[in-house]
Amino acid sequence: MLKLISRNAINKNKIILFRLYTTTINSSNNGSTIREWKKPSLENSYDTGIMVKNSLFKNGNVPFLISNCSEKNQRPISWYTCGPTVYSSSHIGHARNYMTVDIIQRILINYFRFNIIHVMGLTDIDDKIINKSKQELISASELSKKFEQEFFEDLKSLNIKPPMFTTRVSEHIDEIIKYIEKIKENQLTYESTKSVIFDVNKFGIDRYCSLRAANQQIKSDDTLLEKDKKSSQDFVLWKAYNENIDIDGTGNPVCWDSPFGKGRPGWHIECSAMIDSIFKDHLDVHSGGVDLEFPHHQNEIAQCEGHSHSHGSGDAESTQWANYFFHIGHLILNNEKMSKSLGNVITIRDFLSRYSANSLRWICLIHKYNDPLSFSDETLQLCISKEIKFLNWFKIVRSKLKLEQTSVNKVKKTFNHSIELLNQLSETKYLIEKDLKDDFNTPSVIKRLELLMKQTNESMNSIDTDLLFNVQDYVESILNIFGLEVNSEISDHNKTDESNQFLLEKLLDFRSDVKNLAKNEKSLDQIKSKIYQITDQLRSDCQSEISLRVSDIPDKGTNKPYTVDWLDKNHIQLLNIKKQSKK
């Protein structure tokens, strides 16, 4: 019998534990000066019951609390994601980032039933965009629009839900200028050669160190302005127009008028102002790649808090602009971070020309979202094999259910045959909920589903079909929550017009090749060799073009010394990987 514990008692204990827990936040950072993360007020927050890895806190997971909200969905979760700088095709390192955010949000929305307002910011004004437009002899605007469209087409191909709002730097110039003016009014800037620079020392070095300590290496995002800065950690808010640099591929200047003079926004200020345009001075969740943690996100925090409170104001120290930062781990290729600057990228479109979107989603699911992910043929082979394993299980279960429905000799199973699997299903549901509350631990969830499938296989012939249906339905529902398409039915390729047309053309090509061979070749050995080549090529083409696999078997008097299989895309991908690994 289950012992029920009152919700009030649980919540009371959680509050006591949390208060004890937060007294030691950031108290053991080996002498570093990373500032303390301030928990949202427990009296004015909704406790989701989820523990998360928050980059603002370095010593483990923290409770995920929705501030200014006493009841579930009293208000939606505010969430901002840094989008790409749209100057070239996105690669699978980007895809890992956005697909992982998609998975986490699907869990929150479809499993835990939270509402989210998701905003993504696109950088469509940047040095890289200007330089690329010069190479292609087009305007910076035309270039950025081209790659923005490609980016969102790629997201759709990957089954990644689009954000509720997309913000573009070019559409928020007025808001950015006003945002800088407010920071300037709060006495946190200085000007140098008509550029406006954020003064970290005036803001307070202890306040600044929200993600990284002051003694860690400072990396400037604009070497041209380095000589104009008072301190290496200072960063530019408004870049003065440079006629030698800020000209696009059509010869037009990329700049705007402002109270500070002609110029364009610095990189960090763009996100801060665009977030403020929708969410104002508070954000629940900010996500992005781990490479953006410093300096970009740390500078964002400083700007937003500097915008809300002036230098020396009494309540400045109590400010916490964003409560949670989720950083997605690097995608590693050949022991290096996948990066356009390193030139070691696989574009999303190149990947999808060979593999499915589901394959990439499986890769994301079996790795912890904030850990580095090593991309290799072995990783692909593992994930595709896992997907095939799940799809084959669904086919077996559905065939069993269909057979039971149509059988006239059905034997009624007793409940005793099903009780063990029923208990295993209940335990799996309980443990998977714990996994999802443990920082969205999808690798553990997948392992638990595999174990449940194994247990189901062992008792499939002795359990009630209603229970079998419920197990199948639960496994499918979890995969659907993750955004996986799990329809195990392979399309009837041999009845499609395309397949029939292909086979007809191949048959006629084969006839023509054999006729030419008979006419032109005189040596019997040469004829035999060429026929083998032609037939092998025909078999290879059938597999690659219409997923028809022909396998030879020893001739033992049968009229058909071969077998024929219609393959799904996953099998073809796996065969291709194995073939490449042998080369």
UniProtKB/Swiss-Prot annotation:
- Is Manganese tagged as a keyword? no
What is the residue range of the motif 'KIIK' region? 128-131
Alphabetized InterPro entries for the sequence: Cys-tRNA-ligase (IPR015803), Cys-tRNA/MSH_ligase (IPR024909), Rossmann-like_a/b/a_fold (IPR014729), tRNA-synt_1_cat_dom (IPR032678), tRNAsynth_Ia_anticodon-bd (IPR009080)
Kindly list the cofactors needed. Answer: Zn(2+)
Query: Which example biological process does GO assign this protein?
Result: cysteinyl-tRNA aminoacylation
The GO molecular function terms of this record are:
ATP binding; cysteine-tRNA ligase activity; metal ion binding
> Where's it found, cell-wise?
Mitochondrion
UniProt keywords (A-Z) are: Aminoacyl-tRNA synthetase, ATP-binding, Ligase, Metal-binding, Mitochondrion, Nucleotide-binding, Protein biosynthesis, Transit peptide, Zinc
Taxonomically, which superkingdom? Eukaryota
The question of whether Mitochondrion is a record keyword is answered with yes
Find motif ('KMSKS' region) and give its ranges: 337-341
Q: Which reaction does it catalyse?
A: tRNA(Cys) + L-cysteine + ATP = L-cysteinyl-tRNA(Cys) + AMP + diphosphate
Q: What is its EC number?
A: 6.1.1.16
Residues the entry annotates as binding L-cysteine: G83, T123, H296
Cofactor comment text:
Binds 1 zinc ion per subunit.
Where along the chain is Zn(2+) bound?
A: C82, C271, H296, E300
Q: Where does ATP bind?
A: K340
What top-tier enzyme class does this entry carry?
A: ligase
GO cellular component terms, A-Z: cytoplasm; mitochondrion
Placement of sequence motif 'HIGH' region:
84-94
Q: What does this protein do?
A: Mitochondrial cysteine-specific aminoacyl-tRNA synthetase that catalyzes the ATP-dependent ligation of cysteine to tRNA(Cys).
Family assignment from sequence similarity: Belongs to the class-I aminoacyl-tRNA synthetase family.
Give the domain section of the comments.
Answer: 'KIIK' region and 'KMSKS' region are required for cysteine persulfide synthase activity.
Alphabetized PANTHER family for the sequence: CYSTEINE--TRNA LIGASE, MITOCHONDRIAL-RELATED, CYSTEINYL-TRNA SYNTHETASE
Q: What is this protein called?
A: Probable cysteine--tRNA ligase, mitochondrial
In its UniProt entry, the species of origin is given as Dictyostelium discoideum (Social amoeba)
